């Protein structure tokens, strides 16, 4: 018997056979190649599956959709899994499948276990995913958390759909912000010896900077000490800290490098980078967000990748020189303005690093490359696509997914975040307050491009209104039924239950069976659309249906055949909830 999870393919095969028959009869021309779309119906009165095929082909057939639907239905070969086919509305074709097709899904789930829902849809295809990639200038904040949860879930879904996924974090260990970080740590270190030294206005000011500085002092003593006077002597008098705080900050960074020299500056720099990067790694690992590689920006320079990118763009005629700098002719490829690749001092820009990093990704031969950025990176999209064309790479291989930052609320008060100001709420603080499970689920339960108001009180509540609690509670309730079974004289005979699945005839049972059968399709859709919220919504529906069933029926009944069938059914529900939550990075507790 055909499993419900493969029923759509069976119906598609039947429709293709019907189309070929209509071509033979001259109803359709031989060159007609329809795209057959089959959907689950939302109302059982309209059957189990439906297609709009007649509506899409009516023009080619030269007849009304309803008339063509009649001919398609007449041409359908018989099937033992379909009990009825009807035409609805202007020409929709509805299919009613046998109850046995639904019941078979239980045996399929219990046989496959944790692998149920996995497919080979993406077999042989390699996907590169980059997500989070926050600058290692401070702890991850709650805004980064959404990108982390989303990226990890998309990677899990693609893996479940058969794709080979490479997860990567791009470490921005070069550039201006890292210089400011090293300066911030150094000034805090100096304050341990000379309290009169003030931290520049726009430096990083969080407590974590002080912690790094104290560790530096404990390990190296006064090795990096310089007096206030020696520093001030290095700051040009014409730079006003109030009028131009950024220029003043850059002057401090230059002074630090001059006074410390390359070796000591690198020591301070590396201490700051290692401390923060290790914290980020630990934070993400605790959040079940893992990577195959942490790719440092410095590697681009070390391995000549930036120069390789420049040479390739030059070869294709997209580089020119102006005012001593080297520019990318971005406007010729759809960008709003041309971009500097190398400054007049010979140093590469962030843009040059972006070019080199994407060139490296494309050179690895991936079938898909996925970049997950914050929504504030919207302007990067035409820029990146432009330089890919300039490099001679296929832009269609790149998928840029934008994630709106989550907005955290305490009551009705919005919490502001500022990395340099040090007033942000960290991802770790959020996780400790609401738990990993709630954080993971709340982050992905809406479309990534939708704004997310993170309700702390709801996330912590143990109520039906808390979606992750409600789903986990369904799993725990099923575990409780099987624990109760062990305290009775009754048994659970799984093979006998399989033989009596036809006894699952109540509306609640039919509803659960239909929803269970949709799971493999949900995984495929969620993977192909990079949409973990589809799985989250599915699990909410399944949990709601189970709770309704639990409140309406009893499971540990005297009737052996019905008891075993029902226990098999709820065991299948338990398995699907556990499988789905695992893909979302959420636990499935046995007790709550």
UniProtKB/Swiss-Prot annotation:
Major localization listed first in the record, in broad terms: cytoplasm
SUPFAM superfamilies: Anticodon-binding domain of a subclass of class I aminoacyl-tRNA synthetases, Arginyl-tRNA synthetase (ArgRS), N-terminal 'additional' domain, Nucleotidylyl transferase
Entry GO terms, CC: cytoplasm
Presence of the UniProt keyword Protein biosynthesis in the record: yes
EC top class, as a word: ligase
InterPro entries in the record: aa-tRNA-synth_I_CS (IPR001412), Arg-tRNA-ligase (IPR001278), Arg-tRNA-synth_N (IPR005148), Arg-tRNA-synth_N_sf (IPR036695), ArgRS_core (IPR035684), DALR_anticod-bd (IPR008909), Rossmann-like_a/b/a_fold (IPR014729), tRNAsynth_Ia_anticodon-bd (IPR009080)
Subcellular location: Cytoplasm
Locus of motif 'HIGH' region: 134-144
Gene Ontology BP annotations: arginyl-tRNA aminoacylation
EC number: 6.1.1.19
Catalytic activity as recorded in UniProt: tRNA(Arg) + L-arginine + ATP = L-arginyl-tRNA(Arg) + AMP + diphosphate
UniProt GO molecular function: arginine-tRNA ligase activity; ATP binding
Keywords per UniProt: Aminoacyl-tRNA synthetase, ATP-binding, Cytoplasm, Ligase, Nucleotide-binding, Protein biosynthesis
Similarity remark: Belongs to the class-I aminoacyl-tRNA synthetase family.
HAMAP family (alphabetical): Arg_tRNA_synth (MF_00123)
Subunit comment: Monomer.
Protein's UniProt name: Arginine--tRNA ligase
UniProt source species: Coxiella burnetii (strain CbuK_Q154) (Coxiella burnetii (strain Q154))
């Amino acid at each position: 018997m055909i499993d419900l999870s493969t029923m759509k393919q069976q119906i598609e095969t039947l429709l293709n056979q019907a189309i070929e028959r209509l071509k033979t009869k001259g109803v359709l021309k031989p060159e007609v190649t329809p795209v057959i779309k089959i959907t689950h119906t939302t109302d059982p009165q309209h059957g189990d599956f439906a297609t709009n095929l007649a509506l899409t082909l009516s023009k080619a057939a030269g007849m009304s959709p309803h008339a063509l639907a009649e001919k398609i239905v007449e041409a359908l070969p018989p099937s033992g899994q379909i009990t009825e086919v009807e035409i609805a509305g202007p020409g929709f074709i509805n299919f009613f499948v046998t109850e046995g097709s639904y019941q078979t899904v239980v045996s399929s789930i219990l046989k496959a276990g944790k692998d149920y829902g996995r497919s080979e849809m993406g077999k042989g295809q390699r996907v590169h995913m980059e997500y989070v990639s926050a600058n290692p200038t401070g702890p991850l904040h709650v805004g980064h958390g959404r990108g982390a949860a989303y990226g990890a879930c998309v990677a899990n879904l693609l893996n479940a759909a058969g794709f080979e996924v490479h997860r990567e974090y791009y470490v921005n260990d070069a550039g201006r912000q890292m210089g400011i970080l090293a300066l911030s740590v150094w000034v805090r270190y100096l304050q341990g010896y000379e309290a009169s030294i003030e931290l520049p206005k726009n430096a990083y000011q969080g407590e974590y900077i002080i912690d790094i500085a104290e560790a530096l002092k404990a390990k190296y003593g006064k090795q990096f000490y310089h007096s206030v006077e020696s520093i001030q002597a290095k700051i040009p008098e014409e730079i006003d800290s109030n009028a131009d705080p950024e220029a003043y900050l850059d002057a401090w960074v230059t002074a630090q490098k001059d006074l410390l020299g390359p070796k000591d500056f690198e020591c301070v720099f590396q201490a700051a980078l290692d401390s923060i990067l290790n914290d980020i790694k630990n934070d993400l690992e605790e959040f079940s967000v893992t990577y195959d590689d942490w790719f440092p920006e410095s590697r681009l320079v070390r391995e000549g990748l930036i120069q390789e990118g420049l040479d390739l763009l030059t070869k294709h005629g997209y580089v020119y020189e102006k005012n001593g700098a080297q520019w990318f002719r971005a406007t010729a490829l759809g960008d709003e303005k041309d971009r500097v690749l190398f400054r007049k001092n010979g140093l590469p820009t962030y843009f040059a690093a972006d070019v080199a990093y994407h060139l490296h990704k494309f050179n690895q031969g991936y079938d898909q490359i996925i970049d997950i950025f914050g929504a504030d990176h919207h302007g990067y999209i035409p820029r990146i696509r432009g330089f890919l064309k300039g490099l001679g790479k296929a832009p269609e291989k790149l998928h840029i997914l934008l994630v709106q930052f989550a907005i955290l609320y305490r009551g009705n008060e919005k919490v502001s975040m500022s990395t340099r100001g040090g007033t942000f709420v960290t991802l770790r603080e959020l996780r400790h307050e609401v738990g990993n499970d709630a954080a993971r689920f709340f982050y992905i339960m809406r479309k990534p491009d939708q704004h997310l108001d993170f309700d702390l009180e709801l996330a912590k509540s143990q109520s039906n209104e808390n979606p992750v609690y409600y789903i986990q509670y369904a799993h725990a309730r099923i575990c409780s039924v099987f624990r109760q079974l062990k305290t009775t004289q009754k048994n659970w005979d799984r093979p006998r239950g399989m033989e009596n699945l036809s006894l699952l005839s109540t509306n609640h049972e039919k509803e659960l069976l239909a929803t269970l059968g949709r799971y493999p399709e949900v995984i495929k859709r969620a993977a192909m659309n990079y949409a973990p919220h589809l799985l989250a919504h599915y699990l909410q529906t399944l949990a709601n249906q189970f709770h309704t069933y639990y409140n309406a029926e009893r499971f540990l009944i005297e009737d052996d055949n019905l008891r075993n069938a029902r226990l098999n059914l709820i065991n299948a529900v338990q398995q699907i909830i556990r499988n789905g939550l695992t893909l979302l990075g959420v636990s499935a507790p046995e007790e709550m």
